[in-house]
Amino acid sequence: MSNQSDKSRPAADQLMAKYGSEAFQHAPSMTRSRLEERLAQGDALDQHFIKTFVDFAAGMERRRVLDKRTRWLVQIGQFTATRSSGHLEDTLRAAIAGGVPVREALESILLCQIYAGDTAVAPAVDVFTRVARDLGVLAELRKDQLPLDGHDRERSLEAERKSWKPDEENHPAREALMQKYGWLGVSTGIKYRGAHHLNLLAHREALDSEWAGLWLKFTYQNMYSRWVLDDKTRVICTVGDTFAVGDFVQAHDHIIEALHLGIAPREIMEVVFLIGPYFGSPKMAASLKVLEGILGKQGRVAEIGNPPPVK
C-alpha cells in the first residue's frame, strides 16, 4: 500500500485526467481504489514509468481473447505460485468484486500445491482468508466443501472405462498398476494424459513404488479429481502456473493437454502474453517458444498467424 497521506495524494479525477481513462476502465488486476494508490505512488516517484506500466497492463486487460473470469483465475494461480502476495491480494479483491465465485478463486490457489508446493500455497491461503473475511464471503465456503473422500464414492470404473482408447485399455502395465494402486488415480491420469500417464506411473513405480503411490493419490486421485473448476479452466490455469514459475518441461505437457481439450492456440498464446507485464520478457519469450514448437509439430501454426521465423 502507498504511504502517501490522503491529503498529499492527487484526487482520482486528477489522476484520470493525467493518466487517461483507459487505465480506470481496464484496471490491471486490481480494484479502482488500489489503482488510484498505485498511480499516486508512481506519480510521486516517476510519472513516465508508472504511465508506461499501466498503459501496458491495462492494454492487456482490455483484450478479450480470454474472458475476465479465466484471466483472473489464471493470474490468481500465477501470483500464488510465484509468492507475489501483493499482486495476489489485488487480484483476489478485483476478481471477487467482479463476480468470480469465491470457491473458484480459492481453487486456483489450492491447485498450485502441485507445481509450487506448500511454501507458496500456505502464505497465499493466509492472504485469501484475510481478503475473504474483509469482503464478508469467508463463511460461505463452509457450505460447498467437498467431503473428505472428494468424489471417490460417486465415480464408476465401468463408466470411465468406456472413454479409454485401445492403447490405454491394452497398455501392458495398466492392469498391474490398477491392482497395486487402485483404479481411481490411474483412471484420472488416463483421462487427462492418456497412455503417457501409464508410462510415467510405471517409470515412477520402478524408481520407488511406495513414493509412486503417494504421488499418484495426491496428484491424480485427489487434486486432479476435485473438479471444482471445469477441465478447460483448470488446465489453462495450470499452463499459466508453469509459465510463471519457468517450468517449461511441464508447460510443454500441459499445452498439449490443453490443445487436446479444445483450448484454442490463441487462448494459450494470450496466457503467454500476460506473462510479460508481471513476470518479464524472458519468461514470456521462452513460453512462446514452447507453444510455437508444439503448434509447429501439430501443423497448427496458421492458427496463430503463421509468423515468420526469427533470425
What do these predicted regions represent?
Residues R71-F79, L106-I109, T233-T242, V271-I275:
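Short, structured motif recognition centered on aromatic/hydrophobic residues
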Residues F53, T70, L88, A105, ...:
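N-terminal alpha-helical segment
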Residues A57-E61, Q75, L92-I96, I109-L110, ...:
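Amphipathic alpha-helical segments within well-ordered protein domains
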Residues E61, V65, T82-G86, V100, ...:
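Residues in soluble alpha-helical coiled-coils and helical-bundle/repeat scaffolds
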Residues A116-T119, G276, S281-A285:
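Substrate/cofactor-recognition hotspot
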Residues M1-K68, V121-D231, H260, M284-K311:
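Acidic, glycine/proline-rich low-complexity segments that act as flexible tails and inter-domain linkers
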Residues H48-V54, A81-E89, G213-L216, V245-A251:
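Short acidic alpha-helix initiation/capping motifs at coil-to-helix transition points
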Residues G86-G98, R103, A122-T129, F248-E267, ...:
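Extended intrinsically disordered, low-complexity coil regions enriched in Ser, Thr, Gly, Ala
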